[in-house]
């Protein structure tokens, strides 16, 4: 161990000793040797061997390291200085760039604020965020939508552009037009200008908008169409702040492309006819109640107030080239006004039609099957004067005229049977101020879709106003109403004047009024024939006179008639003239002894069935004229020969008689009062009598009106003859009905020749050709009489 310590180089020379000793078994000697070895290892990093032959090499290495560090430090400082300069220069360049960028952005935002109308209208200059927000809103408004959809579509996909245009114009109740800003020439106008201004499109095409507006509004229109800067120079009013400021550079921005235009002007209204079917209800009301500007003189144009709103656009649009023949082609890019014109209905305070617009004429009510009000529209206050609570729980029949109550009850019974179909009836409704208002009620039933039971009846009650209709007093005499049969088939449009013949068809017995036996010496040439209207709101009007219609003191002709009544009472139709068993119309359809059901007497469009009401005046005179033209020496049933009355068939007689029977004067029950017909006796039923077989309405001239006196059971007493006794009541009542030339021919039977067809010329004009004979092939639904063969 001493040798090892004294000579450490020996241990270093033997490389295998160290590891062996160190890795040997633990022991005292080995432990000590291991410690010495560790100590020798620690001393090895020393500079013991550097002292041998090296000298001052230690100090020289340190100097070299210091010099190299100084060089590196100086080089690093130079690099840092250059990088700092570069960074400083870069920062200066970035600041300059940012400053220039901010200046550019500020300039652009300022320009944007001048372009956007909402920004330029502000009194103070807004901040950049406000300018951007207003610019976005303005772009949305120019695009036409308020929401930012992803696909950019702002209209429904199931609508085409044309359908969308029509819907927009219909909803706006206006018309679209495009006008050139430079010349005012109309480039385009929609077809909806016709219902708005009563002018066709052709009057707008090729003209200028200056020609369509009022002369006093031309300067205002030119100002709105102008795009120059000095068009609106001056002072403007700021609506938000209420201050008046001078208009500077904003005028040019306000007049630029895309700026909005909104102005009111007076446009010329035309006189072209407008089809109400082609317009919706709102447009039709606007057309009827279009506001005017005072009274219109004859020959002067009529102007209405129109509100125009739109935008200034570039014309022609991008990608569209004008044709060569266009007058504005080759002038470069121009501007045009795309606007919608709408009527300002409420702008004229002196409009005479405003009361009609504000005053409702109808109200909706709901009833149960009995007719009791269960719901009433609030418009009933302005229509009939009643509050809704005053009508609820009451029957509508209580407010109906006594003469129309049965008609209204029958209509409610029929609408229940129709099950959903609309039934219209006219009656007189008592308003709150005790006035009778002509009211048309269109009713239908609502059925439960599950149980198929009728829940209630819905009625639309319309006040029918007619300025030419004069109020007429009603008959004070009591009336007897016929009962409507269970099989009656009423049409969908039934008025009181149309329902009366149907009720009289189903009446089995009528009151017997004494005194009507025969009218032989009846001078037709002294009685004026009155035309009778068949349609209109005057169905079922009562007579103007409530006294006896056939009193002897009214006319001296009645005394002459009454003197011959008893003398002609016993006259009947001889067997040589008309046999009791012979039928005039033997082609197939005869009259059975039993009354026909009501559905066999249905109405047709052109030739209704023969249901002569007792007041059928012109029918009786017509039969009298036919009776005079018949052959007195004929021994068989009287017929029409071509020499006597060419081309005049029996259906024409029946149709003409019924046409006159459907009179507005012959309302329900007007001629069923016994006191009103003291000189008439109704001795047969309305449809047929027992054992009726013949049609004895045509006799010789010697026994005029003989069918009225023949009351035998073997003959069919037609109701056509009853109309003869009704003629005197219409004499002298000219204020309500005018006599036409068609019926003046009938007043001169003595001068008419058998070959003169002009006796019924205008009467037959309602039925078509006068020379042709009508048969069942032309009227398949007429089963009353077959064609009469000559």
UniProtKB/Swiss-Prot annotation:
Residues 161-235, 349-419 form the PAS domain. Monomer. Homodimer only upon binding to a DNA. Efficient DNA binding requires dimerization with another bHLH protein. Interacts with TACC3. Interacts with HIF1A, EPAS1, NPAS1 and NPAS3; forms a heterodimer that binds core DNA sequence 5'-TACGTG-3' within the hypoxia response element (HRE) of target gene promoters. Forms a heterodimer with AHRR, as well as with other bHLH proteins. Interacts with NOCA7. Interacts with TACC3. Residues 424-467 form the PAC domain. Residues 89-142 form the bHLH domain. Residues 1-98, 465-494, 629-695, 729-790 are annotated as: Disordered. Pfam families: HLH, PAS, PAS_11. There is a cross-link at residue 58 (Glycyl lysine isopeptide (Lys-Gly) (interchain with G-Cter in SUMO2)). This is Aryl hydrocarbon receptor nuclear translocator. It comes from the Eukaryota. Residues 112-168 are annotated as: Required for heterodimer formation with HIF1A. Residues 88-128 are annotated as: DNA-binding. It is found in: Nucleus. Required for activity of the AHR. Upon ligand binding, AHR translocates into the nucleus, where it heterodimerizes with ARNT and induces transcription by binding to xenobiotic response elements (XRE). Not required for the ligand-binding subunit to translocate from the cytosol to the nucleus after ligand binding. The complex initiates transcription of genes involved in the regulation of a variety of biological processes, including angiogenesis, hematopoiesis, drug and lipid metabolism, cell motility and immune modulation. Transmembrane segments: none annotated. One of its GO terms (cellular component) is transcription regulator complex. PROSITE patterns: BHLH, PAS. The modification N-acetylalanine is found at residue 2. Its main location: nucleus. Residues 1-25, 465-480, 629-672, 741-758 have a biased composition (Polar residues). Was expressed at almost the same level in all tissues except for the heart, liver, and small intestine. Residues 60-98 have a biased composition (Basic and acidic residues). GO terms for biological process: intracellular receptor signaling pathway; positive regulation of transcription by RNA polymerase II. Residues 167-171 are annotated as: Mediates the transcription activity and dimerization of the AHR:ARNT complex. Keywords: Acetylation, Activator, DNA-binding, Isopeptide bond, Nucleus, Phosphoprotein, Repeat, Transcription, Transcription regulation, Ubl conjugation.
């Amino acid at each position: 161990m001493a040798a090892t310590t004294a000579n450490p180089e020996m241990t270093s020379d033997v490389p295998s000793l160290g590891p062996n000793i160190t890795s040997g078994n633990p022991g005292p000697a080995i432990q000590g040797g291991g410690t010495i070895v560790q100590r020798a290892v620690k001393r090895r990093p020393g500079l013991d061997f550097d002292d041998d032959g090296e000298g001052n090499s230690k100090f020289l290495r340190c100097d070299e390291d210091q010099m190299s560090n100084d060089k590196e430090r100086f080089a690093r400082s130079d690099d840092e200085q250059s990088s700092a300069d570069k960074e400083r220069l870069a920062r200066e360049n970035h600041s300059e760039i940012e400053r220039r960028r901010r200046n550019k952005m500020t300039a652009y935002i300022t320009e944007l604020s001048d372009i956007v109308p909402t920004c330029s209208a502000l009194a103070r200059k807004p901040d950049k965020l406000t300018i951007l927000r207003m610019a976005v809103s303005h772009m949305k408004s120019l695009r036409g939508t308020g929401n930012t959809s992803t696909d950019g579509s702002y209209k429904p996909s199931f609508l085409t552009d044309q359908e969308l245009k029509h819907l927009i114009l219909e909803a706006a109740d206006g018309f679209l037009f495009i006008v050139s800003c430079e010349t005012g020439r109309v480039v385009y106008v929609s077809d909806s200008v016709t219902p708005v201004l009563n002018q066709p499109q052709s009057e707008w095409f090729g003209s200028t908008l200056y020609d369509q507006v009022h002369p006093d509004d031309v300067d205002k229109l030119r100002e709105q169409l102008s795009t120059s800067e000095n068009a609106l120079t001056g002072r403007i009013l700021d609506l938000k702040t209420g201050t008046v400021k001078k208009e500077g550079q904003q005028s040019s921005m306000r007049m630029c492309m895309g700026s909005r235009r909104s102005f009111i002007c007076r446009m010329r209204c035309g006189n072209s006819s407008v089809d109400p079917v082609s317009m919706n209800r709102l447009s039709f009301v606007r057309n009827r109640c279009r506001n005017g500007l005072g009274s219109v003189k004859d020959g002067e144009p009529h102007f209405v107030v129109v509100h125009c709103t739109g935008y200034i656009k570039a014309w022609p649009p991008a990608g569209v080239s004008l044709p060569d023949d266009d007058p504005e082609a080759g002038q470069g890019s121009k501007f045009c006004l795309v606007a919608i014109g709408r009527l300002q209905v409420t702008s004229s305070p002196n409009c005479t039609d405003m009361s009609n617009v504000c005053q409702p004429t109808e109200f909706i009510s709901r009833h149960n099957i009995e007719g009791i009000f269960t719901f009433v529209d609030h418009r009933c206050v302005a229509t009939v004067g009643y509050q809704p609570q005053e009508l609820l729980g009451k029957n509508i029949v209580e407010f109906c005229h006594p003469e129309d109550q049965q008609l209204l009850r029958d209509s409610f019974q029929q609408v229940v049977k129709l099950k959903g179909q609309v039934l219209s009836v006219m009656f007189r409704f008592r308003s709150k101020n005790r006035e009778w208002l002509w009211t048309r009620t269109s009713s239908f039933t609502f059925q439960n879709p599950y149980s198929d039971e009728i829940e209630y009846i819905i009625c639309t009650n319309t006040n029918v106003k007619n300025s030419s209709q004069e109020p007429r007093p009603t008959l004070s005499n009591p009336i007897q109403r016929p009962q409507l049969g269970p099989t009656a088939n009423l049409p969908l449009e039934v008025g009181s004047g149309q329902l009366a013949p149907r009720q009289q068809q189903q009446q089995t017995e009528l009151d017997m009024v004494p005194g009507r036996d025969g009218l032989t010496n009846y001078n037709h040439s002294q009685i004026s024939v009155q035309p009778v209207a068949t349609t209109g709101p005057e169905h079922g009007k009562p007579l103007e006179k409530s006294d006896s219609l056939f009193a002897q003191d009214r006319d001296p002709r009645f005394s002459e008639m009454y003197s011959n009544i008893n003398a002609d009472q016993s006259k009947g139709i001889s067997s040589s003239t008309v046999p009791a068993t012979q039928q005039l119309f033997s082609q197939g359809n005869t009259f059975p002894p039993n009354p026909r059901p009501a559905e066999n007497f249905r109405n047709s469009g052109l030739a209704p069935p023969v249901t002569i009401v007792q007041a059928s005046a012109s029918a009786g005179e017509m039969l009298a004229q036919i009776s005079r033209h018949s052959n007195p020496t004929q021994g068989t049933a009287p017929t029409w020969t071509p020499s006597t009355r060419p081309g005049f068939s029996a259906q024409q007689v029946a149709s003409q008689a019924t046409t006159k029977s459907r009179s507005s004067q012959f309302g329900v029950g007007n001629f069923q009062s016994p006191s009103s017909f003291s000189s008439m006796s109704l001795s047969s039923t309305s449809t047929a009598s027992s054992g009726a077989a013949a049609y004895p309405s045509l006799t010789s001239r010697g026994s005029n009106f003989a069918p009225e006196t023949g009351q035998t059971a073997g003959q069919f007493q037609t109701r056509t003859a009853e109309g003869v006794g009704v003629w005197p009541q219409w004499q002298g009542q000219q204020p309500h009905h005018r006599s036409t030339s068609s019926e003046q021919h009938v007043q001169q039977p003595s001068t008419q020749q058998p070959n003169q067809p002009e006796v019924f010329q205008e009467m037959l004009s309602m039925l078509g050709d006068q020379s042709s004979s009508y048969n069942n092939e032309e009227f398949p639904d007429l089963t009353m009489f077959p064609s009469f063969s000559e």
